[in-house]
């Protein structure tokens, strides 16, 4: 592994993959910027570190979260993956829940004050302690392997393979869960306006519903993508929560603070050929927000949203995710690109089979 050269005694929590490996054992010179950025999790200022894996590398790697938040979750400050398993926090917690037999979830606070409070409180979150101990990693992997080879996972002695193939809607724990009050408020029948339909100074296009969110896409990446499109982070308002992402429900929402920026956001989506899709079956338009290699669908939400818009309990959020998956499959099958100028298919003409001529038998 490459060696670090730091300007101070404090050592950041960075995984080996981010530091990189080198056959020449060259040193990595790490630049330190006190209070150089705001943590992506707790929003508090922290000491920013940035470096290159090698002198020839053109990529600059920098820390995204503070060391306190990284230690609480046992993740790398740069890639935000588990320090030992190199997987996302959500996936790690799911695997550790299977091994331990009890649910361990890293609950993230919704408002800024609680995020700061949790960061200053210290301690460990979720299954961080399980993967922090190097000696327990092998035992964890062995237990996980035994579980995956067909041992019962729940009280009903249902094997993992059956759970994976089982539809979420048929889960006995979710059958009695009612999500209709939430579902009725989702703007799934709304359409993303085209450039001509965008009104000037209209407050009805300031809130947006966003769905098809993969669990590996963190909230801050979505927020940064919106900031990138608008060229400013002033869309976030202090009066209300600007963005809420519920990964269990595979959806969320964001609110743009003023009319000028909301109009700019609508225009930006419309002016890009690959950021609008149209459903062939019903003509509904969906905006597309591209984060990494994922496509997140956007619809204006005239009614607005709150923290409880995506389920008050984990089971409600899970059932919302299942219902949205069915919608996504249906919409993905019916979507076409904005520039798709294919002509409507003509009705195929009826093909009549030619009547076979009877061949007279000839006696020889």
Curated annotation (Swiss-Prot):
Function: Involved in pre-mRNA splicing. Facilitates the cooperative formation of U2/U6 helix II in association with stem II in the spliceosome. Binds to RNA.
Record's compositionally biased regions (Basic residues): 346-364
Pfam families referenced in this protein's UniProt entry, alphabetically: STL11_N
Any single GO CC term annotated in Swiss-Prot or TrEMBL for this entry: U2-type catalytic step 1 spliceosome
Naturally occurring in which organism (per UniProt): Candida glabrata (strain ATCC 2001 / BCRC 20586 / JCM 3761 / NBRC 0622 / NRRL Y-65 / CBS 138) (Yeast)
Gene Ontology MF terms: pre-mRNA binding; U6 snRNA binding
Broad class of the protein's primary localization: nucleus
Subcellular location, record wording: Nucleus
Name used for this protein in its record: Pre-mRNA-splicing factor SLT11
Quaternary structure and partners: Associated with the spliceosome.
Keywords (A to Z) from UniProt: mRNA processing, mRNA splicing, Nucleus, RNA-binding, Spliceosome
Endpoints of the signal sequence: none
Disordered, as annotated region: 339-364
Family stated for the protein in its record: Belongs to the SLT11 family.
InterPro entries documented for this protein: Cwc2/Slt11, Slt11_RRM, STL11/RBM22-like_N
Taxonomy of the source species: Eukaryota, Fungi, Dikarya, Ascomycota, Saccharomycotina
Residue intervals passing through the bilayer: none
GO BP annotations, alphabetical order: mRNA splicing, via spliceosome
